[in-house]
Design a protein with these regions (language model features):
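A charged, solvent-exposed segment within the mature domains of Sec-exported extracytoplasmic proteins
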Residues: 1-13
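Solenoid-like repeat scaffolds
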Residues: 2-5, 38-45, 71-80, 105-114, ...
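Eukaryotic acidic, Ser/Thr-rich intrinsically disordered low-complexity regions
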Residues: 186-233
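Amphipathic alpha-helical scaffolding segments comprising HEAT/armadillo-like alpha-solenoid repeats
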Residues: 22-40, 62-74, 96-108, 131-146, ...
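Short, surface-exposed, charged/polar-biased interaction segments
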Residues: 18, 33, 48, 57, ...
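Structural detector for internal amphipathic alpha-helices that build alpha-solenoid repeat scaffolds
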Residues: 10-26, 41, 48-62, 82-96, ...
Length: 233
């Protein structure tokens, strides 16, 4: 990564970029936090590398680096946006309480740009992959519930809950279907995928029956996408 040869440095970065999150977590423990911060602050470093460097800081950083990450998250320029995902996950790893509080704050604030909200969703997905403590899982569900209440993010939150097979918000999800802010086709399909995947109970069965009556074609298409029925030739 530090090679004076642009080609060698680029190849090294690509190897990092292709690595799994779990591999990066282990490697991050061997990194030098001061070096990572210098790279993040170096205007000559390409923007596409900043998120990775910030992510790695989460494995080797110290208490003094928490304030650095918090400051990075407050910035709104393009380089800060490129750093955001990695910095958020790094903060959650270094100080879960401050990290989740910061993420929830971004999701709740009315003036948070959409791009930042989407970064928060991506950070939640990564945190779910690399953090296994029950307390972290509880924070993940809490953050997704916040996103669920925001129409522009609800389909993403519902899809993550479905993939995680977490059904604790089923009643809330069914109740908001078709209400203001939750009527776009992509949104309706997210609700339907969730209902088709969730354990069947009377409220789910009723919801699916109503959708079958209102839009049988959509139900069929979503079932096909989930492999629940064979695709038509």
């Amino acid at each position: 990564l530090q090679s004076p040869s642009r080609e060698i440095a680029s190849d090294a970065f690509l190897e990092f970029a292709k690595a799994s999150d779990s591999t990066l977590v282990e490697f991050s423990k061997k990194m030098n936090p001061a070096l990572l911060k210098s790279w993040i602050l170096d205007p000559k470093v390409p923007e596409e590398r900043l998120g990775l460097y910030a992510f790695l800081l989460g494995g080797c950083g110290r208490d003094a680096d928490i304030s650095f990450l918090l400051e990075m998250l407050k910035l709104q320029d393009s380089r800060a946006q490129a750093t955001f995902d990695g910095a958020m996950v790094a903060l959650i790893r270094l100080h879960p309480d401050k990290g989740w509080k910061a993420l929830d704050g971004f999701l709740k604030a009315d003036d948070t740009p959409l791009q930042t909200r989407l970064s928060c969703i991506r950070s939640i997905k990564v945190a779910n992959e690399i953090m296994q403590d029950k307390s972290d899982k509880a924070e993940i569900f809490k953050a997704l519930n916040i996103a669920l209440k925001q129409g522009e993010l609800a389909d993403l939150a519902i899809e993550e809950l479905r993939k995680m097979k977490y059904w604790g918000f089923t009643q809330e999800i069914l109740n908001i279907y078709g209400t203001k802010g939750y009527t776009a086709p992509v949104m309706k399909r997210a609700f339907l995928r969730y209902a088709l995947t969730a354990p069947k109970d009377p409220q789910i069965e009723k919801f699916l029956a109503q959708l079958e009556t209102k839009d049988s074609q959509m139900v069929l298409e979503v079932k096909e996408s989930l492999g629940l029925v064979p695709l038509k030739p």
